[in-house]
Amino acid sequence: MFDIGLNITSSQFDHDRDEMIARARAAGVSNMLFTGTSLEESEKACAFARRYEGCWSTAGVHPHDASTWNDESAARLRALAGEAQVVAIGECGLDFNRNFSTPAEQEHAFTEQLRLAAELALPVFLHCRDAHARFLALLDPWLDKLPGAVLHCFTGTEQEARETMARGLYLGITGWVCDERRGLELRALLPVIPADRLLLETDAPYLLPRDLAPRPKSRRNEPCWLPHILKQVAQWRGEDPAWLEATTDANAARLFLKNASPA
């Protein structure tokens, strides 16, 4: 299995990171993509990708951190993207829900990262929350210059899913879909997503699936729970889990690993 979204640099993993990776492997999660959310975190994610076999990383600035973008940011990301472990630009995009950075700052950092990804011919790992129309408006001019993109941790509506997929993007599905309180709309639209546009991720340590039984003592999510997400998604889509695993693994490899060096 391939977890395309793991926040490896989170301090929640500081005391047992090696053991967490070992639990993932024991559960059948052999490949992982570590998310970079700032320049510093992207550098750390790349270092962890060097350390763990079968793992890669992204390099980017999350919309929450867009206020930190300056003239040096693109140069530092460009240098980092030259590392063999870095296979995508991101996490980048727009988040108008909390606006930790202003919308103008977010839009500038997003556009500059799209420009960089186009220059380097790298796919993009995207974030969008409460900003769908503006997100697409900024993304559209770059689509024919990018080798691919995934909208990570998709939690939008069916209409938003259709508009996103019409542009050729992949959708990343997390344990959000296992939440009986807020994930039912996403669960209902799962069959709308073509299998060749679907990717799976935990977004660990966040979004622990709420329907795990028995429920873990800790609320911290881990990549070892990706098989549970896969099983549930396959059930709600009416597909064989083994087939869906092979399909989503192939999707991840096609998007991220076309030109990657073996990890």
From Swiss-Prot:
InterPro entries tied to this protein: DNase_TatD-rel_CS (IPR018228), Exonuc_TatD (IPR024918), Metal_Hydrolase (IPR032466), TatD-like (IPR001130), TatD-type_Hydrolase (IPR050891)
Stretches of the chain forming a coiled coil according to its record: none
Alphabetical list of CDD domains matching this protein: TatD_DNAse
Top EC category: hydrolase
Function: 3'-5' exonuclease that prefers single-stranded DNA and RNA. May play a role in the H(2)O(2)-induced DNA damage repair.
Keywords: Cytoplasm, Exonuclease, Hydrolase, Magnesium, Metal-binding, Nuclease
Family: Belongs to the metallo-dependent hydrolases superfamily. TatD-type hydrolase family. TatD subfamily.
Disulfide bonds: none
Oligomeric form and interacting partners: Monomer.
Record-listed E.C. numbers: 3.1.11.-, 3.1.13.-
GO CC field: cytoplasm
Location, primary (coarse class): cytoplasm
Protein name, per record: 3'-5' ssDNA/RNA exonuclease TatD
Cofactor(s), names only, from the UniProt record: Mg(2+)
Compartments where found: Cytoplasm
GO molecular function, one term: magnesium ion binding
Residues binding a divalent metal cation: 91, 127, 152
